[in-house]
């Protein structure tokens, strides 16, 4: 007797039949036995099949299955939980005597996609990855499928109606890959794309469009027909209306063309209307979300710079009216039944809102039932969101989000550089503001974006599991995702893979690969470069260790592991390391240090390694990803790859006599000891009472032997080594470790009072003697726990290190239920250094002093007077069209001052320099004057408008 047989009605949708066959293939991958897929028309035939199997799996769709109707009539099942719903499914186990003791698993879908998701639920339970086809991941082996009645379930409606991705910026990577593997952009490639989308519980796709023509490349309409068969809802990109792509117009236009030769609704109105009409006639019969509106060719503004806002709005209003009439004529007389979308992308956002002088399109009759697709700023930060009043819009709202971008200030397209906590923080905000109708994410070439894409679509499908209630759950998601892909690996290896994923994405999102260059991280200050290099080494070592384990213990997973984990991690970290080393090379070259050449050699090795990684990726698994790594990614000097540069390295020629330079670690101070240059250096580390050790580094400047010796030091300080020789060849630098004995220092200090006392360190060099003053913090005040003390001339406080936190409540009129509690919560591992604080619920507005929540920080300074407070914030954008992203500051119970985190005239996008710096650095800084008293000060930071995310505070004179 067979363990499993799939049985389906002959009348079932062909797409469901194809998916059932794929799931049967999944069962074969797990058990090495492929179940048969049989068809019939009646319960009698089902009973006959039941004699031959332990379990018969019966997929069926409500409204398209006579079998479901009969079983419901006979009271064997109840479909009330799924009937009339969208994309729901139920698993019903039946064990009637007429089926000879055989277990029947009835997978009932509320519609085609519901049935498909129900089928793929079996694959999930068997440990089959959604990337089984895309990446070739084999599931763990099992002897039996082991279906049990306890697995019965009903899956509710997905949280977001339309959920999908956009294949974009596809040249040179995705396009090259398509041509080499599939001969173009036809059904042979979209077969895999559609399967991937459905396995990820998506339902909506924008196809490749730089050079592709989805409606022609199938060949012909084959792509569209295949999408319809699988239940994929198609759309065109944000600037391709009426089911026509920009490349189609390029291909069809001409002086003798019926479509004219100008993408201009004023001068070529009839030609453009004909072009749109033919697109609707060709593809309007399929399931689509039709893009409305009109932008310029190649993703540009439709009218020139001289056009007024009113000109643009009136043109767009005319376009929308015309398009709705065409849809009514060509698709459905009741245009309200046709899903339509207008993307408020870039300049179109301004046309929607208008200004004080010109009314925008908000509330326009032409948009009454149209989905309004809002957008991020192309760097993962949301732009405007619906106000409470706007959320009544019948068509609902969508969000166009980016994991890939081709545009100013710098493109990022090569490898995933997006971070899950960022996606969570932004997309939960979108959902809570009512953006629930459509989520579409730009995934570029798809390859290497599998991890964040999974998270995006899982959140869209089940917001209750991964949305607002899942604060600080991205690490858990990462572990689950790792288990989903590599379930046969040991738990220890799975944990290490999850650590690599979290580690590299957190580090890379701080500065994306294409935007990375020498000196982005300071070579010495705050150990920025050193700490980052050490973190890269840690992650790469772990990745290499796991890779070695995979090759030895699970070689059949090597290709998938490389594609999903190793290549993205190693590629991006190696690139970042290369630029960090280039920065060290340039810094040391300015000192004349021969050690700069070692860094230069290391840069060259990184560049070589970059080429090796891309080549190996292309060759892996018989060329499975050939072409996918082709995007330029090193040293962008413009927004795109034009004139991009490999790192510039400096070669230092040796001096012709013994010379060395003494540097104080973490500072730019250096000296050779010349008697003509007698200014002392200072080592400030021991001003921090928690500091026990510090460093001084000596670099050789010549290939002649250069001796040094510590000739004077405080007795409370140990130095090692005390002397040595640099030869400029095998030994061209020396690190001296300085360790303080604070007990001995306290016993031997001279009795002076104050904040610090100094020791002196002298180092004899070939050029003379270097003198280094070493101040030490003393007489620290006794302060309450949680109080920061100024010992080094500044105070740094992570946002999560508050002394007190006070809850507030939502301001009247801004959120339903004004007495709802609002409080700051910590988002762990989010931000440049440690974490971030944000007020929840995210839609709440606050009035400082009345209802706004606040964070309170305590700090001690020795001198009263004016200080500068620098706030480090996420580079968020205002959620409303008022250009306000506000917070309040209060020091020592004084006046609460309100500040806007963005300047007047704030501009997102092209030539918005303030915005650009924020998104490239992944941080926004704002300096504020504060008046402090001697002793303990109390600083409060209030949340005023949604979107304020605080990471760190710096106070200095």
Name these PLM-found stretches.
Residues 147-148, 218-221, 226-229, 256-394, ...:
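Gly/Pro-rich turn-and-neighbor structural signature
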Residues 138-143, 478-636, 853-855, 873:
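C-terminal non-catalytic alpha-helical accessory regions
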Residues 131-183, 188-208, 395-398, 784-807:
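An acidic-aromatic substrate-binding cleft motif
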Residues 1-156:
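Contiguous, structured surface segment used for ligand recognition
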Residues 198, 203-206, 216, 374-380, ...:
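Structured mid-domain segments that build the active-site/substrate or prosthetic-cofactor binding neighborhood
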């Amino acid at each position: 007797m067979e363990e499993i047989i799939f049985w389906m009605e002959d009348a079932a949708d062909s797409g469901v039949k194809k998916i059932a066959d794929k799931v049967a293939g999944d069962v074969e991958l797990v058990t090495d036995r492929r179940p048969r897929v049989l068809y019939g028309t009646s319960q009698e035939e089902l009973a006959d099949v039941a004699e031959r199997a332990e379990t018969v799996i019966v997929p069926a769709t409500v409204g398209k299955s006579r079998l479901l109707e009969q079983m419901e009539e006979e009271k064997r099942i109840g479909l009330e939980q799924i009937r009339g719903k969208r994309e729901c499914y139920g698993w019903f186990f039946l064990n009637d005597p007429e089926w000879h003791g055989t277990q029947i698993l009835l997978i009932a879908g509320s519609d085609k996609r519901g049935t498909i998701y129900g089928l793929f639920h079996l694959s999930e339970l068997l440990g089959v990855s959604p990337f089984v086809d895309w990446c070739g991941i084999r599931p763990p082996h099992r002897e039996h499928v082991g279906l049990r009645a306890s697995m019965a379930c009903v899956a509710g409606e997905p949280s977001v109606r339309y959920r999908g991705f956009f294949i974009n910026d596809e040249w040179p990577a995705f396009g090259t890959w398509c041509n080499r593997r599939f001969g173009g952009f036809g059904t042979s490639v979209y077969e895999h794309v559609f399967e991937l989308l459905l396995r990820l519980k998506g339902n909506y796709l924008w196809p490749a469009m730089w050079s592709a023509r989805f409606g022609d490349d199938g060949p012909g309409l084959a792509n569209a027909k295949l999408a319809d068969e699988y239940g994929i809802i198609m759309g065109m990109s944000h600037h391709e209306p009426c089911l026509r792509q920009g490349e189609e117009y390029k291909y069809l236009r001409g002086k003798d063309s019926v479509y004219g030769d100008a993408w201009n609704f004023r001068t070529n109105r009839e030609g453009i209307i004909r072009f749109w009409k033919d697109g609707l006639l060709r593809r309007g019969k399929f399931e689509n979300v039709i893009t409305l509106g009109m932008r310029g060719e190649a993703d540009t503004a439709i009218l020139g710079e001289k056009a007024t806002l009113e000109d643009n709005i009136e043109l767009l209003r005319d376009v929308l009216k015309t398009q709705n009439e065409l849809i009514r004529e060509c698709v459905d007389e009741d245009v309200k039944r046709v899903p339509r979308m207008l993307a408020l992308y870039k300049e179109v956002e301004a046309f929607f809102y208008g200004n004080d002088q010109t009314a925008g399109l908000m509330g326009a009759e032409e948009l009454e039932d149209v989905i309004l697709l809002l957008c991020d700023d192309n760097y993962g930060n949301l732009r405007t969101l619906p106000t409470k009043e706007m959320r009544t819009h019948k068509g609902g709202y969508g969000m166009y989000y980016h994991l890939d971008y081709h545009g100013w200030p710098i493109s990022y397209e090569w490898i995933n550089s997006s971070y899950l906590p960022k996606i969570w923080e932004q997309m939960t905000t979108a959902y809570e503001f009512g953006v629930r109708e459509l989520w579409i994410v730009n995934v570029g070439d798809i390859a290497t974006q599998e991890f964040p894409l999974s998270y995006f679509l899982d959140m869209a499908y089940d917001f209750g599991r991964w949305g607002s209630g899942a604060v600080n759950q991205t690490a858990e998601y990462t572990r689950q995702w790792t288990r989903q892909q590599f379930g046969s690996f040991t738990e220890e290896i799975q944990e290490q893979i999850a650590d690599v994923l979290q580690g590299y994405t957190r580090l890379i999102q701080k500065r994306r690969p294409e935007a990375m260059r020498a000196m982005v991280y300071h070579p010495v200050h705050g150990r920025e470069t050193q700490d980052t290099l050490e973190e890269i080494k840690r992650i790469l070592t772990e990745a290499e260790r796991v890779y070695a384990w995979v090759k030895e213990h699970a070689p059949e997973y090597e290709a998938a592991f490389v594609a999903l984990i190793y290549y993205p991690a190693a590629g991006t970290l190696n690139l970042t390391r290369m630029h960090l080393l280039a920065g060290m090379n340039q810094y040391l070259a300015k000192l004349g240090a021969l050690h700069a050449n070692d860094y230069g050699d290391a840069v060259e090795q990184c560049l070589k390694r970059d080429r090796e990684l891309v080549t190996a990726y292309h060759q892996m698994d018989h060329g499975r990803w050939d072409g996918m790594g082709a995007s330029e990614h090193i040293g962008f000097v413009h927004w795109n790859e034009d004139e991009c540069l490999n790192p510039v390295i400096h070669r230092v020629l040796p001096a012709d006599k013994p010379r060395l330079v003494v540097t104080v670690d973490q500072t730019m101070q250096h000296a050779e000891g010349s008697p003509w240059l007698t200014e002392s250096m200072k080592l400030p580390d021991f001003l921090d009472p928690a500091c026990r050790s510090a460093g001084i580094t000596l670099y050789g400047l010549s290939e002649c032997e250069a001796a040094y010796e510590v000739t004077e030091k405080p007795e409370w300080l140990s130095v090692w080594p005390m002397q040595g020789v640099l030869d400029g060849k095998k030994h061209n630098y020396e690190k001296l470790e300085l360790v303080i004995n604070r007990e001995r220092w306290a016993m031997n200090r001279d009795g002076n009072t104050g904040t610090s006392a100094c020791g002196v360190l002298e180092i004899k060099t070939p050029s003379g003697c270097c003198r280094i003053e070493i101040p030490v913090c003393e007489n620290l005040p006794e302060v309450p726990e949680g109080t920061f003390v100024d010992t080094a001339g500044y105070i740094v406080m992570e946002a999560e290190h508050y002394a007190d936190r006070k809850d507030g409540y939502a301001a009247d009129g801004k959120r339903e239920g004004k007495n709802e509690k609002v409080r700051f919560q910590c988002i762990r591992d989010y931000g440049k250094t440690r974490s971030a604080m944000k007020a929840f619920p995210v839609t709440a507005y606050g009035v400082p002093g009345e209802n706004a929540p606040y964070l309170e920080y305590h700090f001690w300074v020795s001198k009263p007077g004016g200080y500068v407070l620098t706030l480090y914030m996420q580079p968020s954008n205002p959620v409303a069209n008022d250009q306000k992203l506000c917070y309040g500051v209060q020091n020592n119970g004084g006046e609460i001052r309100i500040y806007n985190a963005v300047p007047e005239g704030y501009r997102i996008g092209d030539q918005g320099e303030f915005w650009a710096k924020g998104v490239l650095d992944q941080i926004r800084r704002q300096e504020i004057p504060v008046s402090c008293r001697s002793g303990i000060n109390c600083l409060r930071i209030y949340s005023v408008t949604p979107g304020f995310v605080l990471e760190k505070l710096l106070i200095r004179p």
